[in-house]
């Protein structure tokens, strides 16, 4: 089985998505970036834009209005001000 990335997408109102995924594309404040399993840890601010989640050949898109991302060896947590699909 290929490595997966533990991913949580959270808004102030609710947990929008919690899943093991292949990759995440994030709209960073200083430019878009991708996160794969075992990525180096860091935190970053997010700008308004599209977050993409890839898993098993399928992609989900979410519209964010900014927030923060926390990348750890265990996974990624996106805390967004608001989230639309």
Residues covered by each model-derived region:
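Compact, glycine-rich, soluble single-domain proteins
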Residues: 4-85
């Amino acid at each position: 089985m290929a490595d997966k990335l533990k991913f949580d997408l959270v808004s102030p109102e609710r947990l929008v998505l919690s899943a093991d995924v292949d990759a995440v594309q994030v709209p960073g404040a200083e430019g878009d970036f991708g996160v794969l399993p075992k990525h180096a840890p860091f935190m970053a601010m997010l700008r308004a834009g599209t977050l993409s989640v890839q898993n098993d050949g399928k992609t989900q898109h979410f519209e964010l209005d900014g927030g923060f991302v926390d990348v750890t060896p265990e996974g990624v947590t996106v805390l967004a001000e608001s989230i639309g699909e």
